[in-house]
């Protein structure tokens, strides 16, 4: 099958590098900016929950408090530690979108670059990368699940189905809504 779009030579590396530079620049900006914002009430709630680890909470799954507990354990109880993993998850989601778009387009890095760039420019996505909440791990695990399901269908290997189930399960620990998406 002929790819829908193919790259040759320097073009392929150019668009890959540009995507990684754009994702890196946005992530560095987010990491700098999150240290200047005060915590929101939801973030403070997740921070309190992180100090009392449990398998579930009254109104939220446990992933975000667990992640905050891990970051706080490494960096101390700071506002930066509470928010640290949101920009990281959003950067990983953009990288996954790049690779998923590359697969879907038949190996083209140009459409993959534009897909990742468009994702970075969505206002809701940009906002979710600044605040600690259920959205950033949900988006990451959902995107990972989509990528793995696509790979399972294309490559016909059971490993991808198992990994997609694991990613969906981790997404379920982030927000129960993932089962309906």
Give short role names for the model-derived ranges.
Residues 162-168, 177-181:
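Transmembrane-embedded, aromatic-rich helix segments that form part
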Residues 1-29:
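Start-transfer (signal-anchor) and selected internal transmembrane alpha helices
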Residues 23, 112-123, 168, 172:
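Short helix- or helix-capping micro-motifs
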Residues 35-46, 56-68, 76-80:
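Extracytoplasmic catalytic/substrate-binding loops of multi-pass membrane glycan-assembly enzymes
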Residues 62-66, 76-95, 128-132:
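Loop-to-helix entry region of an early transmembrane alpha helix in multi-pass inner-membrane enzymes
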Residues 124-138:
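Short acidic/glycine- and proline-prone juxtamembrane loop motifs at membrane-interface regions
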Residues 102-106, 145-160:
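Membrane-interface transmembrane helices that cradle and orient dolichyl/undecaprenyl
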Residues 16, 97-121, 140:
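Transmembrane-helix signature of polytopic, membrane-embedded enzymes
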């Amino acid at each position: 099958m002929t790819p829908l779009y193919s790259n040759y030579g320097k073009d392929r590396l150019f668009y890959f590098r540009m995507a990684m530079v754009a994702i890196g620049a946005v992530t560095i900006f987010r990491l700098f900016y999150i240290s200047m914002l005060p915590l929101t009430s939801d973030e403070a709630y997740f921070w309190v929950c992180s100090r009392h680890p449990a398998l579930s909470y009254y109104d939220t799954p446990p992933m975000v408090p667990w992640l905050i507990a891990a970051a706080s354990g490494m960096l101390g109880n700071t506002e930066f530690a509470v928010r640290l993993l949101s920009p990281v998850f959003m950067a990983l989601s953009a990288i996954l979108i790049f690779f998923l778009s590359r697969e879907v387009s038949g190996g083209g890095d140009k459409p993959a670059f534009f897909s990742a760039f468009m994702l970075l420019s969505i206002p809701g996505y940009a906002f979710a990368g600044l605040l600690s909440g259920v959205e950033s791990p949900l988006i990451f695990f959902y995107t990972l699940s989509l990528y793995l399901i696509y790979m399972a269908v294309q490559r016909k290997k059971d490993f991808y189905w198992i990994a997609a189930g694991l990613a969906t399960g981790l997404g379920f620990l982030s927000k129960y809504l993932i089962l309906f998406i």
